[in-house]
Amino acid sequence: MARKSNKTAMAFAMQAQTDVFVIPSASLDLYPVSNLNFSIAGITVENPEYTGSIHKNGPDVVGKTISGSFNINMRPPGGDDVPVANAYIPGRVLKAAKFTETIVSAPIPAAAEAIGGAGNTTTAVTLGATAGTAVDLYKGMALLLPTIIGPARDKITAIRSYSAAKLAALMETLDLAASGTYQIPKQVSYQRSISESDAPLLSVSQWLDGMRYDLVNFRISGLRWVMPVSTRDGATTPTFEVTYTATINSYGDEATPAIPAKGATPSFKDGKLFVAGKAVGGSNLTVDFGLRTAYAPDPNYADGSGAGELVESTTTINMDRQAYLKAQFYTLAMAEGQAYYPVYAQWGYTGGKLVQVVVPDARFNYQSPTLGQDFITETGDMYVDVFDRNVCINFPYFLA
């Protein structure tokens, strides 16, 4: 019988040591993926030898390269409580792309406390007596402000920056100045790291209808977060788009394991999209991390190169956004001034099933108006410079 594409599965394990394959569990380490592409490409060298005729021998096959791509739905961990370290399997992919996993396993403080008495506006709030004083201690994290008007999910916001005076700048503009109490809710966060340490490798088992490939030194070579807005005219799921390179450790015939259902993925709607402190409309938001991978020459390896290493990353935001009047939202002036502006997206309804994308500081490139459809839109890039936690994704847990 013909082999079937839908009988495809991937299992992911963190790899502690280069070249040492860690066997992923065919049950515990599985996670559903889509749009898998898997390439085994030969490395060839032309044979220059004369043959005594007009005909030449074919190239010598001297090795192979393994690469591919796949998508993972931007599905939060779910459940009633934050997962333990390394339990959220898409988080392993994020860690392999140079993100740090941060788990807040208990609210800070344990009970909501009064906010500070000074500096509270629609864009900033002073945290209370028990809050820490280290600069940027809570940068990029979710924050619960119960006095925000609306359902429980709307009371969740995020912190753009944090000062030693406990002033938390917000990623959005509130309708009213912050008052009452605050709390940093339980959450699992993945924060972009600019440390000098190398991103970890993965070991991956990949099944293609009855055949398993074990991939060692699995290196994330490209990562995009694609967040289309779901509308009354059509819905599309937000995804992590991943490309990779690897080495085949082994392969053989083995039945594809069944992947447990993970539930629906929240759509990007009925949430928040703030750019430069303004709620804006649009159809798509994409964060491209611009990863570049290289391979050091090494004759100790079968293909003459060592394991892939991340050597460069340039982060760019692209969005298709409604165009506004100069008095409302003037991107031309913002591009000319080259100041930093926050970009913030949030969607989902309940604790454990809500997504926050937090970019504290980004610069505008010039944006182009687009006509021809029903509405005038603007498209263009924003650039994210090298700051620690310059991009974060949070999955907060809170009571509805």
Residue ranges of model-derived segments:
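Signature of extracytoplasmic/envelope-associated structural regions
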Residues: 1-400
